[in-house]
Amino acid sequence: MFLTMLKSKIHRATVTESNLNYMGSITIDEELMEAADILPNEKVQVVNNNNGARFETYVIKGPRGSGVICLNGAAARLVQPGDLVIIISYAIMDAGEARTYRPAVVMVDGRNKIVEVRQGEAHGPAGADTCP
């Protein structure tokens, strides 16, 4: 049996741009992509912490170190610059690998600079805005 599991996520990134007239996708700073092991053209799920919207799109590599998080095309209607989003990637694994795999959790600051990369995730205390 194969399971779809969390591979990685970029946690609470700040949307820097939205471009309705572009063909689609999310542009992500190359440095963030590497830290989260996300490839160009990979499908990701985006969760908007400000309005609850959840949607899927694919990734375009943005300039390294720029902090860019830009939603393009129709997805631009679901975010505003300044919104906080979680960008999630998944992987299909067999049950054995799924039991031991530890996803990368990329924590960023308000300018989308990497603060910490964690391996795995745990439930945080009520009211916490980051995971322990």
Swiss-Prot record:
The modification Pyruvic acid (Ser) is found at S25. Pathway: Cofactor biosynthesis; (R)-pantothenate biosynthesis; beta-alanine from L-aspartate: step 1/1. InterPro entries: Asp_de-COase-like_dom_sf (IPR009010), Asp_decarbox (IPR003190). Its EC number is 4.1.1.11. Its cofactor is pyruvate. One of its GO terms (molecular function) is aspartate 1-decarboxylase activity. Is synthesized initially as an inactive proenzyme, which is activated by self-cleavage at a specific serine bond to produce a beta-subunit with a hydroxyl group at its C-terminus and an alpha-subunit with a pyruvoyl group at its N-terminus. It is found in: Cytoplasm. Keywords: Autocatalytic cleavage, Cytoplasm, Decarboxylase, Lyase, Pantothenate biosynthesis, Pyruvate, Schiff base, Zymogen. The active site is at S25 (schiff-base intermediate with substrate), Y58 (proton donor). GO terms for biological process: alanine biosynthetic process; pantothenate biosynthetic process. Pfam families: Asp_decarbox (PF02261). The keyword NAD does not apply. CDD domains: Asp_decarbox. Substrate binds at T57, G73, A74, A75. Belongs to the PanD family. Catalyzes the pyruvoyl-dependent decarboxylation of aspartate to produce beta-alanine. This is Aspartate 1-decarboxylase.
